[in-house]
Amino acid sequence: MLSARTLIDRDGITLADVSCAHGAGRGEDEPARTSHGLVFVRRGCFVRTVGARTCVLDPTMAYGANPGEQERIDHPHDNGDDCTWLRLDAGLAAALYGGDPRLPARSLPTTPRVDLEHRRLLAAAGRGGSDEHALVERAIGLAAAVLERDAPARVASGRPATERARRAVVEQAREALAADPAQSLPELGRRLAVSPHHLSRVFRALTGATVSRHRMRLRVRAVLERLGGGERDLARLAADAGFADQAHLCRVVRAETGTTPSALREALA
């Protein structure tokens, strides 16, 4: 009656498309949850009960979930529901929510912007072929947007307080990525002792690019250098530069430069 399709599973994040075919009526007590996360309702309506707390959830809502919570889901109507599950490991949940990984286990209204971003993220992850670092960065931003509306002070805590501190964090992130572009946003956050959400936001504000876009640009510049040095094997170049495959390399290089690696190879060699 419940099916789930995992679309992202890396860097402390899982994004899954979850469908429930439960008919109208009272549900059964579910096993206790084992992880932190946010659930976004896309279709249907149900009533979630955890202990003495009950909330009605529909496509204008999300809710937080935590390890140890035992819930019961009741459906007032037939046809079940469709939801998106965004799991966060404890360290990432704590970094996003002011140091405490325990997320608000209640209904969390989603704005039209947040709902649309959530659906776009789900679609991009489901299509495949997307930069997984970019998907992770978007997922972190989505979680922060929902939590920030509920507890802005908690989400804001840990943000570099001064312009000088923000610039220092961005410079340190650029140094780290120049040494190893494969580092993920959560890894950078841990390395620099800053919330990945704040790092992403400050990085974009000061550079005009997301962390994932900057990472991809570093990889494209490395590709151009290799092409200028006479590299002929695009499959090998894609693997060395950190692209998923040759097709991924070609898409990104064309998006960044307006032309193909083959044409650039002839122009630069």
Regions found by a protein language model. Name each.
Residues 1-8, 262, 266-269:
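Actinobacteria-biased recognition of intrinsically disordered, low-complexity terminal regions
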Residues 97-159, 173:
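Amphipathic alpha-helical segments enriched in hydrophobic/aromatic residues interleaved with Lys/Arg
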Residues 115, 119, 136, 140, ...:
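Conserved terminal C-lobe alpha helix of the protein kinase catalytic domain
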Residues 162-173, 207, 216-219:
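N-terminal positioning helix adjacent to the helix-turn-helix/winged-helix DNA-binding module
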